[in-house]
């Protein structure tokens, strides 16, 4: 994980509230598995004040704190771990912060862990992909084909790069992501807030049930597309909350983190929180379902999955 440096102006939050939100996730995960937290040297005192003593703080210069996107994607090659180092340019130059330091984070993590890093020839982020471990990867036209990310690529060339990096052989392309994700500092359509695979291969998919919300029609389109691909779809209904202080929200239970023995899942103090818990208990049998207030994270433009990046065991 990465310790946040500041809040976004439009979030309506102060710096301390943002740091508290990130820290709550880190502390919860640390109950189940080791946690490393990258932290700008100027923020070490604030981090030490908020984080469990078991969390390993690593001083690193970084712009922002979305480790899913700026950290490496770990793969196994010839029985050894390799860190995939995607090019990062601030979600297609769509952030009020810089990104030069963040583009170097994946390589630095690989160096800290003493594993080889492979620099990719395309711009991509960890939140822009999701795999089932069986050869399938989910991608989004508005992310990988974004002209401010990869202007010289088409679906075929992007898929070739992705398959080469991840060892996948089937790409399923979503046409777009959620409406709010195109707003201000959004990612322009990351899949990790829309759909994710359960361990048994079923696909959890965000379902907005309010006809007033701009994401309402997306469910029908995706359910049909995924069914045509031969996937079993499990709807995960969106919270009843539709708007925040800015506009339509993208509150989603899809954006959770699976750790050793548990699933760390968003909570929105919403009537649908309990139904989401039940759905996740079905999707992840035998794991604790730990729900944390995620409204501050979503006000910043992401969720629990967005701020975490799993490191396979036996490394570092």
Task: Place the predicted regions along the sequence by residue.
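The feature marks the mature, well-folded catalytic cores of soluble enzymes
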Residues: 2-316
